Amino acid sequence: AVLALCATDTLANEDCFRHESLVPNLDYERFRGSWIIAAGTSEALTQYKCWIDRFSYDDALVSKYTDSQGKNRTTIRGRTKFEGNKFTIDYNDKGKAFSAPYSVLATDYENYAIVEGCPAAANGHVIYVQIRFSVRRFHPKLGDKEMIQHYTLDQVNQHKKAIEEDLKHFNLKYEDLHSTCH
């Protein structure tokens, strides 16, 4: 029943969220852009490698990932709705298992974000660390998964102290998370 509730398009459903955000009023203008999911609490998400979310100005979302064998690249499209630190994602048919409410628990906007969500694809609950994907810092060849993995690991290492400090608020350590892109 909780999964069904979590998959609805409502920001009012608090049943999905287990933690209070450190950023109650997310600045969506600063959050917009591309983010790579580096690691998360759900082992189920490890089958989706180097997941990249691109949040755009018109509430459109384009997400790309590679399968666990690193062979098939998939693109899914959806819409987002932000309110406070929470947002919902409503993907098209191909991405429905990821349509869910999410909450930004912590972010410095420029380098990393810690997000909590309730997608069915993560067995109903996940906390994950995202790394800001900036072409100013990195410009991989299209589809070059190894370059994206290297970039992600490098960015995690550069900002690990701050990430670890924020994860402590949620009783987590980075090394306890399941890697999804390094």
UniProtKB/Swiss-Prot annotation:
GO biological process: symbiont-mediated perturbation of host defenses
Keyword Ubl conjugation: no
Bilayer-spanning residue ranges: none
Localisation: Secreted
Keywords: Allergen, Glycoprotein, Secreted, Signal
A single Gene Ontology CC term: extracellular region
Residues carrying a glycan: 72
Pfam families xrefs: Triabin
Signal peptide: 1-12
Main subcellular location of this protein, as a coarse class: secreted
The keyword Secreted is assigned to this record: yes
Protein family (similarity comment): Belongs to the calycin superfamily. Triabin family.
Protein function: Probable ligand-binding protein.
Protein name: Allergen Bla g 4
Organism expressing this protein natively: Blattella germanica
